[in-house]
Amino acid sequence: MSKSTVFTVLLLLLGMAAYSFGWVQAVAEAAAQYVQIFNNDALRLGLLACIAAVLMLPAFLYLHYVTQSVKNMTAAFQKLTQSHQSCCDFQHHRLCSRYAEEVKSLRDRYKNVRQTYVMAAVLCQVIIFGCMFEIVKAVPFRLHTPPIVSTGMALLLILYLLFYMRMYLLKLFQHGTLFKKILACVLTGAGIGWMLSFTISELLFLIILAAIQQIGSFIYKRFSNRGFTSLDL
């Protein structure tokens, strides 16, 4: 069993224990008391969404860095392979010594991209989101809408999430094992059923948080692309 797997299992067990013993709910209720200082529901939701976005920012930035690094590493590896077409026989695995050195140098350049770090960043986001969502549930909001409105908003949010994950889902159903496909279908169905039970305040919190993260993602991509363009020049 790899270190990342052990780390993931331990964190999941810790999270399940904290939730089952009521520690998460107790902390959420205590935090909700401070949020209730503000009398405006829109201000409460905006404040909670901003706090969640700020707490998730380090993991958010690292995951964007990993995504960009993987793209750059793939492009650099393809360029490296093309430059050694004349001296290496890739079909029969006859490679020159310079190619091996350059591949090692390329790997060292992107050594910060590790599966353990990625898993830790994802779990960090999940834990922070779960805690903030519990705080939203603990705050007594005065927002009331007809069921059709909340159901419609939930469906729009579900469609957005499915569109956001479309590349991963397509890759999974094209190349994944049968077990992974069944697991993905079960988890997707459970997630859709769970989201349809959300209140209007919970849905608005998710929408505001998603909007903040989309804006942050857009800004990050603009600045990172400018940085890479200036490096290329």
UniProtKB/Swiss-Prot annotation:
GO cellular component: plasma membrane
Coiled-coil region(s): none
Keyword terms of this UniProt record: Antibiotic biosynthesis, Bacteriocin biosynthesis, Cell membrane, Membrane, Transmembrane, Transmembrane helix
Membrane topology category: Multi-pass membrane protein
Job of this protein: Involved in the production of the bacteriocin subtilosin.
Gene from which the chain derives: albG
Protein name: Antilisterial bacteriocin subtilosin biosynthesis protein AlbG
A Gene Ontology biological process term: bacteriocin biosynthetic process
Locations listed in the record: Cell membrane
Entry's transmembrane regions: 4-24, 46-66, 116-136, 145-165, 192-212
